[in-house]
């Protein structure tokens, strides 16, 4: 990993304008194939327009990210917070409506992926897949402008902070074989 050409800008309160400027400079030197923003709501969103609310500011930042992707012809991955509404649902699976502070994120994005770990909510079996939840993680592809939506399961090894393909335990496979 240390040999990969990854550049990290950890300047506090970086704005999308600063991200764009850095990405354009790096792209001009053929050193920018992707931009990742971790996370959108931490970006500096101060603007000259005084009467903007937080939702409008997040919408503008989301739009700037979309324009950056088009301008430089690279993927821009925006990480975003979710609101806590999914905590109240039966299976705790997040949905597009849980994107925090802006429907514009959903509108601008070509793809929206949401993460879920049922064991964090005390579940022992995932209601939808019926898989045991110990180490189970779910990537919910909630929007895909050019493809299918659905779910992808992975195993999360917390002690190593490692993600691998999910393979149900042998007992589950034996019990559910038909």
Describe each region flagged by the PLM.
Residues 40:
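Conserved Walker B
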Residues 44-51:
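Conserved ATPase-coupling elements of RecA-like P-loop NTPase cores
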Residues 1-13:
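Conserved P-loop NTPase mechanochemical-coupling segment
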Residues 43-44, 85:
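Catalytic P-loop NTPase motifs of RecA-like helicase/translocase cores
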Residues 7, 15-32, 49, 60-72, ...:
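C-terminal regions of RecA-like/P-loop NTPase motor modules
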Residues 79-81:
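Conserved H-loop
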